[in-house]
Every structure is written in structure tokens, then in C-alpha cells.
Amino acid sequence: MKNFLIYGSYGYTGSLIVEQAIKEGMRPLLAGRDERLLRVQAEKFGLEYRAFSIDDTAALDSALREVDAVLHCAGPFVLTYRQMAEACIRTKRHYVDISGEIEGFEALAAMDEEAKCSGIMLLPGGGFDVVPSDCLIAHVAKKLESATHLEIYIKSIGSGVSR
């Protein structure tokens, strides 16, 4: 059994995660809709893959039964989180996504009791919306060319609707 599946593994962030997983000695199961892109990626890293639409419940459940957890990287998450989270609850697999979309955060929080009953964790925002942090890192790297490491700390100063 592979330890986790990356759905959307060939997208920008998914592909970065796959590369880092390989560096760390992990062998994730790659997944997504586009079989051609998956095949190329799988051959590059010597990994297995499963091609299926997130709306194909049988294929989704079958792939999840091969792993312990899912790292969901296929957005826009407003169109994909529910199918994946419901499949994780059905198959008792942990769920982590890289979304920064509040609708998904709220919807997954509403599924908390179902997740607990299945003995799993639903964790949206595992990457704290990667675009802002990527932009910050790129900006800092240009300003501090000799730097070799960067640590980011984030503090919330309240919330609400921005206007």
C-alpha cells in the first residue's frame, strides 16, 4: 500500500509537492484526470498513477482504498473538495488540501462530525493558500540574494469581509 495519493499531482503546486516527496524518500500514488500528463510524470519519477475524474465515485473510492491519506491539489477547490472529502469519509482516509478558499474551509468544518465518526481528519488549507506565500518568497529571494533559508510566520489580526 502506498502511504498517500496526490490528486492533481501534475499541476503547478502538485508537481512541486511530488518532487519534494521524492527527495524525502516518499513514493506517493499520483492521480488526476489527464492520463497523458500522469503517465509522463509517473515515468519521470518511477511512480504508479491512477487517472480518473473526481466525479467518478467508483474510481475515486477504488484509488483511495490503496492509500492511507489524500493530498488534494486539484482546484478550483470550490468545484472539487466535496467529492474528495466525501470519498475520504466513505473509505476512511485522511484528507489534506492546499486550498485557501473559505467556502471549502467552512464546508469541511460542517463535515467534522462525519469525519470523526469515520476516524479521519479533514484538513483544508494545508498549504495556507500557496500563491501568497510563493509571491512573498520570490520577493524576499530577490531582495536577499545571499540568503540560504527563509522562515515565514503568519499572524492573524482579526477577520471579516474585505471591501
What are these regions (language model features)?
Residues S99-M121:
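Rossmann-fold NAD(P)-binding glycine/threonine-rich loop
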